[in-house]
Amino acid sequence: ITNHRVGGGWLSGGASNAGCAVLRQLFSDGELQELSRQINPEQSSGLKLRPLPAIGERFPIDDPSLQPVLEPRPVSDALYLHGLLEGLARIEAEGWQRLMELGAPPAERLITLGGGARNPQWRRIRERLIGLPIVSRTTPPAAGVARLALRAVATANALGHDAKESNHLP
């Protein structure tokens, strides 16, 4: 679980090993776009996949020996991608549930960034399985990190710290 100071509050989250690395191991960007268009996000794929890139998970389940589940692989690549996207969405839903179990207030909506934000089928699958509205924001790579860095420098300056002379910003 990670906590980041943002403005006057905290942004809490969890870092799973699951993510787009698995998708990139299996499909090119062009294939992801083409296959995604073939997915009906309102229907279940019927697959129960756990798309980890390697053995081990850290959130929402802390288990260094947790095995990826990438089979059965159907003949249809579109159906396989559908199942992988659902698997990622289920892991995300478990993460939100785990955060609430630990005392985080329930989320009202999610804001998604990056490449996945441009995939309407995946966004809808996530909405269906997580149960929250998801708003897409398409921003350049690393824009979020750049904003956090800018906020940290502004905070340091406001507190009288010289960012160039400090190895650690508040």
What are these regions (language model features)?
Residues 1-110, 118-141, 146-169:
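Active-site core segments that coordinate phosphate-bearing ligands/cofactors
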